[in-house]
C-alpha cells in the first residue's frame, strides 16, 4: 500500500473537539488530554486573530454550550460572609449580546465590549476587557470580577476569589485566557442600565488631502481630550470607505443624559469648523434609554469574507492630555495607510480605570496611567500569501508607527496585539507582573498542559506549542524580562 505524503493535513484546525455541556465534561476532557499528553486548546467563540483558540494536531475543548446565567441581588463569594452587591454569574459560553439582553430584561448591565458575538468571560475578560462606553466610568472588565470557577490542569474544580486561591484569581484578571485552567463560569458586578445620549461627529475627505489628519483627526482628538476633561467618554473610529477616501467619526457618550439638545449644544460649544479645509463634516445625536442597547446593536468587527489582523498600543495620560497631544497622535497615525475595510479606533481609558488602583490586576501597571487604547484592524486578503504579507507588514511597518506615539512605554493589549510580538512579556505585563504570572503558572500547571500563543510560558515552546525548547521555563522567562 502506497504511503500518503501530507505535510499539513488539516492546517491549524484541531484533530478532535470535545463540545462540552457541563463542568464534569470539562474535567473529563482535561484529564483525558493530560493522560495522553495532548496539545490542548480552549475555544468559545474563536474571536482571536492570533489563533490562540486553535492549534495543529490538537485536542480542543469547546465551551460554547455553557449558557447558564444567574442574577444575584447580593453576591456572597465562597469562603466569605460579606455580600458584594448585585452580580451575575455567566457560563463560559455566554456571548456579550446574550448578557446584554438578559440584563436589559432584568434592569442591569455588565461591563462588556462592543462586539456582540465575543464571549463575555473568555479571553475578553481574562485578558483585561475594555468597554468603549463603560470603562471610563466603571473601569476594566477585570475590575468587576468577584469569582471564577476553574477546572485546573489536574481536572479539579477550583474556586478562585479574594478568599480562595488568590494567586490564581489575580492571574485570571489579565493574565490571559487558556493559560491557567478552563474557566467554566465567572461572577461579575452589575450596575444599573442607565440611559446614554450619543453624539456623532463625522468627517470625510480625499485620501490625498493631508489636512484630513492634520486638521480633521487632530480636531476630533482635541474634542475627545476636552470632553474627557469634562468627564465624558468617547471613541474615535477612522476608516477608508474607498481607496481614494478617508473618514473619521467621533462618538461622545453622555451618561445619564436624555436631552438631545443639551448634548448637541455642549458639542457645538467646543467644536471648530473644518469645512474650509476641504473636509466635509456632519453631526447627529441619538438617545438610548438603556446603555446596553448601544453596545448590543453594534455591528460585528469581523468581515464576512475572511479574517483580520490586529495591533494596539496604550497612550499615556501624560501624552494624550499634553497641549500638543492631539496633534502629535494625529501626525503619527497619519503614517498608517488605511485600505478599504481597515479600521483604526480608540478605546477610552483613564477615568475609573485610573482610579481603581486598589483592585489588583495582572495587566501591565501602565494601564492605570493610560488615557486611550489605539487599535489597528487590518483586513486580510483570502490567500496564504496575502495573510503572510499582511502579517509581516503589520509587524515591520504598522506596529513601529503605533509604538512611536509613546516611545518610552510601548505597551500593548494582548487581546488585540500583534501576533508576532517578540517582546510580549514586557509589552503585555511588565517584568514584575510577568515574574508573578510565571510563578502562578508553575504552581497550577507545571507540565504546561495549557498553552497559548504569546501566553505566559509560551517562550519555552515552538510557535505552535508542539515541541518544548530545552531551557527551563523559569530560567527562560527570567532572561527575557531581565530579572
Curated annotation (Swiss-Prot):
Coiled-coil stretches noted in the UniProt entry, renumbered to this chain: none
Cofactor(s) in the UniProt record: FAD
Domain FAD-binding PCMH-type as annotated: residue spans: 10-193
One BP term from GO: indole alkaloid biosynthetic process
Biological or metabolic pathway of the protein: Alkaloid biosynthesis; ergot alkaloid biosynthesis
Entry's EC annotation: 1.-.-.-
Entry keywords, A to Z: Alkaloid metabolism, FAD, Flavoprotein, Oxidoreductase
Disruption-associated phenotype: Abolishes the production of clavine alkaloids but also of more complex alkaloids such as ergopeptines. Accumulates N-methyl-dimethylallyltryptophan (Me-DMAT) and traces of dimethylallyltryptophan (DMAT).
Entry keyword Oxidoreductase: yes
Name of the protein in its database record: FAD-linked oxidoreductase easE
Lineage of the organism: Eukaryota, Fungi, Dikarya, Ascomycota, Pezizomycotina
Gene: easE
Amino acid at each position: 500500500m502506497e504511503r500518503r505524503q501530507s505535510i499539513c493535513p488539516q492546517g491549524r484546525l484541531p484533530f478532535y473537539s470535545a463540545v462540552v455541556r457541563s463542568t464534569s465534561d470539562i474535567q473529563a476532557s482535561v484529564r483525558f488530554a493530560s493522560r495522553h499528553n495532548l496539545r490542548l486548546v480552549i475555544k468559545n467563540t474563536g474571536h482571536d486573530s492570533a489563533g490562540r483558540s486553535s492549534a495543529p494536531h490538537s485536542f480542543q475543548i469547546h465551551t460554547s454550550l455553557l449558557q447558564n446565567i444567574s442574577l444575584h441581588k447580593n453576591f456572597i463569594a465562597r469562603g466569605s460572609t460579606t455580600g458584594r452587591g448585585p452580580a451575575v454569574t455567566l457560563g463560559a459560553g455566554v456571548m456579550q449580546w446574550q448578557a446584554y439582553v438578559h440584563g436589559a430584561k432584568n434592569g442591569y448591565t455588565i461591563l462588556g465590549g462592543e462586539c456582540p458575538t465575543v464571549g463575555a468571560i473568555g479571553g475578553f475578560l481574562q485578558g483585561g476587557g475594555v468597554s468603549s462606553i463603560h470603562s471610563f466610568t466603571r473601569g476594566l472588565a477585570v475590575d468587576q470580577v468577584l469569582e471564577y470557577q476553574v477546572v485546573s490542569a489536574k481536572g479539579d474544580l477550583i474556586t478562585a476569589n479574594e478568599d480562595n486561591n488568590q494567586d490564581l484569581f489575580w492571574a485570571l484578571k489579565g493574565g490571559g485566557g487558556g493559560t491557567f485552567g478552563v474557566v467554566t463560569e465567572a461572577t461579575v458586578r452589575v450596575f444599573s442600565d442607565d440611559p446614554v445620549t450619543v453624539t456623532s461627529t463625522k468627517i470625510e475627505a480625499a485620501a490625498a488631502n493631508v489636512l484630513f489628519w492634520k486638521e480633521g483627526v487632530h480636531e476630533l482628538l482635541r474634542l475627545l481630550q476636552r470632553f474627557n476633561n469634562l468627564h465624558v467618554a468617547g471613541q474615535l473610529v477612522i476608516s477608508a470607505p474607498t481607496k481614494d477616501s478617508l473618514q473619521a467619526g467621533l462618538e461622545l457618550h453622555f451618561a445619564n443624559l436624555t436631552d438631545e439638545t443639551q448634548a448637541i449644544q455642549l458639542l457645538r460649544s467646543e467644536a471648530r469648523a473644518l469645512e474650509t479645509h476641504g473636509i466635509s463634516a456632519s453631526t447627529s445625536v441619538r438617545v438610548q434609554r438603556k446603555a446596553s442597547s448601544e453596545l448590543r446593536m453594534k455591528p460585528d468587527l469581523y468581515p464576512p469574507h475572511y479574517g483580520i489582523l490586529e495591533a494596539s498600543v496604550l497612550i499615556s495620560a501624560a501624552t494624550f492630555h499634553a497641549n500638543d497631544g492631539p496633534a502629535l497622535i494625529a501626525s503619527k497615525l497619519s503614517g498608517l495607510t488605511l485600505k478599504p475595510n481597515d479600521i483604526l479606533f480608540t478605546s477610552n481609558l483613564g477615568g475609573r480605570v485610573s482610579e481603581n488602583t486598589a483592585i489588583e490586576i495582572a495587566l501591565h501597571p501602565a494601564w492605570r496611567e493610560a488615557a486611550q487604547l489605539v487599535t489597528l484592524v487590518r483586513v486580510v486578503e483570502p490567500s496564504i500569501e496575502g495573510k503572510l504579507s499582511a502579517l509581516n507588514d503589520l509587524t515591520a511597518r504598522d506596529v513601529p508607527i503605533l509604538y512611536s506615539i509613546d516611545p518610552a512605554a510601548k505597551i500593548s493589549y494582548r487581546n488585540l496585539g500583534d501576533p508576532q510580538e517578540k517582546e510580549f512579556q514586557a509589552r503585555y505585563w511588565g517584568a514584575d507582573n510577568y515574574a508573578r504570572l510565571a510563578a502562578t503558572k508553575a504552581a497550577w500547571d507545571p507540565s504546561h498542559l495549557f498553552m497559548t500563543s504569546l501566553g505566559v510560558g509560551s517562550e519555552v515552546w515552538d510557535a505552535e506549542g508542539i515541541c518544548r525548547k530545552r531551557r527551563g521555563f523559569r530560567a527562560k522567562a527570567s532572561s527575557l524580562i531581565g530579572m
